[in-house]
Amino acid sequence: NTLRNDNPRMNARVNFPTNQPKKILLTSKDCDKELNFFKDNDVQIYKNKDLAQIIKSFKDQDFCSILIEAGPKLANSFLQLGLVDEIISYTSNNELGDKAVSWFKENNAIENYGFKLESSYKIDSDIKEVFKKNG
C-alpha cells in the first residue's frame, strides 16, 4: 500500500553525479509499473515473505547497507525479527487523513525493541529523529 499511496521516487536528487540506490520491492501484489518507483532504475521484486532469507540474499549480493522505506506492518516485521539496527523517523504536523496508520502504538514503542534516541533535528516544521539499537 505504501508504494501506491505515497508514489515515492526513491532516488538521489542531487546536482552532481552519484550512484543511485538499488531499488528492491517486497510485495505480495501486482504493481503499476508507471509509478515513480519504477522509473530510472531496475527494480528487484521479491514476493517471498521470509524476511530473514531476503536479507541473506542481500548479503550474498554484497550490500553493505539497506534503507527500508516501509509502512507500519512491514517495518514492524523487520523489527520483530531483529533485522534493524537504526531507525530514522520524520514527523510532520501535516495531517495524513483517515487512511494513515500509526507506526508505534503504546505497547509497541520503539524503545520496546531496544532502541535509544541518539539525535533529534528540526528541519523547517518537521522533526527528524535517529534511534540506534542498544548494544
Language model features with spans:
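Enzymes that bind and transform nitrogen-containing heteroaromatic metabolites
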Residues: N1-G135
